[in-house]
């Protein structure tokens, strides 16, 4: 790993990464709004911010001093999180310190393997690569392919694992044990409470990513509304 990669990974250790995303058509769907949200969560103690889309990545990068984890979503089915080398290059060029991409074993649209994608990206950019995985096997595959960080982002969304009501602790714990310090595991996906985040960390996660429960007021409002019915 490069010195840059080591520094970024060390800066995230034991911390909270906050995902600042709004979906098309939503009131908060604007790069400057997401940049303001990112500044707010940094003030609250986030060690990194995850942002979606080139405009958002660039805007967030200009507003925070913590690392920016960038993704580019194309659609919402199959491989859609930074699905090709072209997408990864663009996310890097937009200013991301960490490029998160699909780290599953599925075939990629540009015909490149995950290992080829990571190798080419790292040859061109001094960037950290996070693999968004859907299972333990995905995580081991992504580590072998050269990913610097292994995330549980896609657990429950690829058909390989059931969608748990909350974080997939089983995958988090298994990856930590199987990787045995070779790659940091980032717990992400359906972490909605501080207790859930704490449990993920206690299982050995390097850092925890929380999005909806912090930065998506429409969903949070719905949770309260439903509880009052």
Swiss-Prot record:
UniProt catalytic activity? an N-acyl-D-glucosamine 6-phosphate = an N-acyl-D-mannosamine 6-phosphate
Q: What name has this protein been given in UniProt?
A: Putative N-acetylmannosamine-6-phosphate 2-epimerase
Q: Which CDD domains does this entry report, sorted A to Z?
A: NanE (cd04729)
A Pfam family name for this chain? NanE
The protein's UniProt keywords, in alphabetical order, are: Carbohydrate metabolism, Isomerase
Q: In which pathway does it act?
A: Amino-sugar metabolism; N-acetylneuraminate degradation; D-fructose 6-phosphate from N-acetylneuraminate: step 3/5
> Which Gene Ontology terms describe the biological processes this protein takes part in?
carbohydrate metabolic process; N-acetylmannosamine catabolic process; N-acetylneuraminate catabolic process
The free-text function statement in the UniProt record for this protein reads:
Converts N-acetylmannosamine-6-phosphate (ManNAc-6-P) to N-acetylglucosamine-6-phosphate (GlcNAc-6-P).
Keyword Isomerase (UniProt): yes
Q: Where are the transmembrane segments?
A: none
- EC number per UniProt: 5.1.3.9
**Annotated Gene Ontology cellular component terms:** cytosol
Q: What class of enzyme is it?
A: isomerase
């Amino acid at each position: 790993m490069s010195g840059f990669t080591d520094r970024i990974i060390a800066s995230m250790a034991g911390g909270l990464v906050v995902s600042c995303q709004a979906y098309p058509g939503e009131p908060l769907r604007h790069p400057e709004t997401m940049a303001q949200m990112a500044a707010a969560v940094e003030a609250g103690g986030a060690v990194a911010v995850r942002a979606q889309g080139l405009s958002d990545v660039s805007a967030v990068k200009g507003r925070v001093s913590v690392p920016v984890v960038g993704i580019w979503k194309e659609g919402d089915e199959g491989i859609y999180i930074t699905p090709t080398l072209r997408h990864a290059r663009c996310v890097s060029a937009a200013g991301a310190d960490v490029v998160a991409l699909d780290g599953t074993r599925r075939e990629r649209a540009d015909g490149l393997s995950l290992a080829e994608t990571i190798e080419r990206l790292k040859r061109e950019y001094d960037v950290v690569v996070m693999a968004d995985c859907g299972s333990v096997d995905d995580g081991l595959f992504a580590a072998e392919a050269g990913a610097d960080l292994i995330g549980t982002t896609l657990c429950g969304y690829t058909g390989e694992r059931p969608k748990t009501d909350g974080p997939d602790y089983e995958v988090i714990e298994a990856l930590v044990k199987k990787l045995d310090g070779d790659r940091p595991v980032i717990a992400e996906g359906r972490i909605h409470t501080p207790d859930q985040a704490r449990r993920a960390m206690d299982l050995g996660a390097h850092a925890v990513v929380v999005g909806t429960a912090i930065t998506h007021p429409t969903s949070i409002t719905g949770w309260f509304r439903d509880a009052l019915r």
